[in-house]
């Protein structure tokens, strides 16, 4: 087994491996960094703002400014000048700053519509052992709705709609391991202020554990297949031997 292999796995790393095995190899084992994007900063700031409001309340504009400027400061320290960050279409830093406060206000309206935090469950992190590895994850919220149902909620800020509830099923599995059951699970869309709930009964704990143990076995036996369908949006393309990236030679034996 490669000594550089991360000791833990996550839903995100599993997704990266499915997206492109070689991208997983470059980013997780060779520490090739993807270029920072504005939507990472914007999404993180919205998450931070909802967390601050849920814990302390306050005026939306004040809460948003605190979250936004703190996130920008942290990300510039790590990723350089914001003017060098990628952005999608018109959604640049100005767009995210202006739209972010609306996203927070939609969350506040959602909360005031009868949705309450279940037992202070806000941004909880877990490490769940499975097979020969550990699954690391962070869960946004567990809430109760206006009918008293206990609901797992994941906050989404991106433009793409969710196509599958696997992420919710993984989080529900982690909650069950902590002795917490939920009646429903859904994605809350910060762009619309609405929640969509999904049926995750077919993705039972055995299926989730099988998925992660199989993923772990594959990565430990160096199964890192490239996926050429996703090259157009790859952040490490310039380091990829399969596409003759401009930095390929710098990788030495990795891309040999």
Where are these regions (language model features)?
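A non-catalytic, helix-rich entry segment at domain boundaries
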Residues: 49-125
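Nuclease catalytic cores
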Residues: 14-58, 97, 123, 236
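Short acidic, Pro/Gly- and aromatic-enriched capping/linker segments at domain boundaries
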Residues: 1-13
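Short intrinsically disordered terminal tails
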Residues: 1, 148-149, 253-256
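Non-catalytic protein-protein interaction segments used by genome-maintenance enzymes to assemble
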Residues: 121-173, 177-178, 207-211
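Short amphipathic alpha-helical segments and their helix-coil junctions
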Residues: 3-6, 21-33, 82-84, 148-153, ...
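Metal-dependent nuclease catalytic regions and adjoining charged, substrate-binding loops involved
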Residues: 7-9, 87, 131, 160-161, ...
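Short, flexible loop/turn motifs enriched in small residues
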Residues: 10, 18-19, 134-138
């Amino acid at each position: 087994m490669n000594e550089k292999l991360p000791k833990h796995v996550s839903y995100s790393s599993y997704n990266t491996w499915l997206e492109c095995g070689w991208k997983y190899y470059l980013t997780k084992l060779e520490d090739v960094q993807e270029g920072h994007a504005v939507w990472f900063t914007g999404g993180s700031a919205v998450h931070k703002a909802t967390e601050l409001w849920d814990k302390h309340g306050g005026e939306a504009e004040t809460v948003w400014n605190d979250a936004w400027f703190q996130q920008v400061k942290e990300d510039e320290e790590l990723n350089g000048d914001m003017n060098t960050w990628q952005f999608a279409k018109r959604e640049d830093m100005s767009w995210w700053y202006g739209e972010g406060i609306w996203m927070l206000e939609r969350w506040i309206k959602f909360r005031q519509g009868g949705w309450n935090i279940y037992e202070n469950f806000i941004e909880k992190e877990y490490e769940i052992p499975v097979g020969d590895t550990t699954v690391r994850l962070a869960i946004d919220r567990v809430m109760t709705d206006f009918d008293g149902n206990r609901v797992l909620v994941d906050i989404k800020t991106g433009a793409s709609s969710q196509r599958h509830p696997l992420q919710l099923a993984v989080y529900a599995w982690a909650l069950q391991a902590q002795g917490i059951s939920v009646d429903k699970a859904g994605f809350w869309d910060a762009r619309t202020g609405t929640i969509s709930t999904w049926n995750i009964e077919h993705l039972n704990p055995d299926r989730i554990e099988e998925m992660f143990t199989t993923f772990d076995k594959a990565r430990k036996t160096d199964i890192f297949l490239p996926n050429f369908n996703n090259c157009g949006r790859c952040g490490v393309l310039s380091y990829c031997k399969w596409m003759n990236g401009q930095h390929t030679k710098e990788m030495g034996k990795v891309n040999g």
